[in-house]
Each structure stands twice: as structure tokens, then as C-alpha cells.
Amino acid sequence: MIRKWETKEIGPLLALWLESTIHAHPFIKEAYWHESVAVVRDVYLPAASTWVWEEDDEIKGFISVLESRFVGALFVAPTALRRGIGRALVDEVKRHYAWLSLEVYQKNLQAVNFYHAQGFRIEDCAWQDDTLQPTWIMRWPVDQTPLT
């Protein structure tokens, strides 16, 4: 079931984020993610609109949208991958926003391919100084302006 996240659930959400982000980004030192917990907890989550996928009273995935349009996080528990949870969460936020953008590590091919399958397209590239990794900037929907 998808529902809005409640701030009292910060502990389980952070635990899911840390486990999932370490699993999804083996090319980044694990210590970086541990050092980022406070920023996620104190800055990003309070500023975001977040929806969770809950199953058997446990959060199995979540999506957070910052600044009304930027997908700052989409994570699914490693034990719940490939069950449609990520797709359902993306579909949920698409119902709330006319367009969305996100940034994904270029080396995270599974995520890049997932976002492509959800209709996102690469618009630009960027560099993350903190992780020393290149990223793709992706957007949904793709520009639908008709050619004349």
C-alpha cells in the first residue's frame, strides 16, 4: 500500500535508505553513506514530500520529491526488489506532478535502465564532487513540443 510518510517513521525510513543506498552504489565508499545520514535526516527528508510502500506494517520502499519536482530519492529494500514497488512509487508521484527530474549515478545502470522504462530521458550530465562520480540528469516527460 502506498501512503504519505509520517515523520514519526524517521528511524525505519533512514535504515531502509542506508541499506538500499549502500546496496545500489557499490562503487561509492560505504563510509560516505554513513556520513550522509544526518543530512538526509535533518535536511532532505524534512524538505521533501515523501510516499512509502508499506507491507505487513513495514516500509519496503519510498520516494521523496524535493522542490516540487526533483526526485531526491527512490529506494526499495534489497529483499523487495523486482516486485513492482519502485514502478508503483514513480507512478504515484507522476499523478501529483506535471513533470519530474532526477539525478542518477552513471554507473548505476540498473537505476538508469529503470528510469528509462518509466519514461525518463537523459537531458544532461553532471559531476558529484562529494563522491567523485559522474551523474545523469533525467526528466519526465520528455519534451512533447511538436516540430513545425
Which functions belong to the PLM regions below?
Residues M1-A15:
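A short beta-loop-alpha structural element at the N-terminal edge
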Residues A15-V40:
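Conserved GNAT-fold acetyl-CoA-binding loop/helix
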Residues R41-V52, F70:
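A short helix-loop-beta-strand connector motif used in the catalytic cores of GNAT acetyltransferases and
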Residues A48-G61, L66:
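Conserved beta-hairpin
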Residues L66-T79, S101-E103:
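Conserved acetyl-CoA binding element of GNAT-fold acetyltransferases
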Residues V76-P78, R82-R95, N113-A117:
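Conserved acetyl-CoA-binding loop-helix of GNAT-fold acetyltransferases
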Residues R95-K107:
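Conserved GNAT acetyl-CoA-binding A-motif
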Residues E103-Y105, R121-I137:
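Conserved catalytic-core motifs of GNAT/GCN5-like acyltransferases
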